[in-house]
C-alpha cells in the first residue's frame, strides 16, 4: 500500500498529479487498481499509471456524491490521457524521460481549472486525498 502521510495534496514529481477524494474505507482496494486497469482504451496504461500514494486526512467523513470507484477510474483515464495529449502537442518526454517544456496542469488546462481543483480539495478535507 502507498505511504501514509499527515498532509494531503502534494503533487507527484512531474507536476501532473490527478487528485481524488473518497472515504478511507476503500483505501484497501486501491493497490490492485493498476493491475485491474491494464487496457481500458488507454495505451500502455500499465506504464503511465503509477502506484497509488495515499495521503490520509484524519477527519470525519461525509457521504459520497459519486461512487468512489468511478472517481478512481476517471482519474486513471485522465492520467493515461496526459501522455497522449503531450505527444500530440509535440511535448512528449525525450528518451531520458525529461520533459521538452515546462509542463504543468495549469499550463495544459488553464489557471481556472487549477484554482477550481485546489478549492475543491480544500472543501473536501473530510476525505482522504489520493494522488495518482
Swiss-Prot record:
Keywords tagged on the record: Membrane, Transmembrane, Transmembrane helix
Q: Which domain of life is it from?
A: Eukaryota
Q: Does the keyword Membrane apply?
A: yes
Ranges that cross the membrane:
66-86
Describe its membrane topology: Single-pass membrane protein
Compartment(s) of residence: Membrane
> Record's Gene Ontology CC terms?
membrane
* Extra information: Partially overlaps NUP42.
Q: What is this protein called?
A: Putative uncharacterized protein YDR193W
Q: Which organism is it from?
A: Saccharomyces cerevisiae (strain ATCC 204508 / S288c)
Source organism phylogeny: Eukaryota, Fungi, Dikarya, Ascomycota, Saccharomycotina
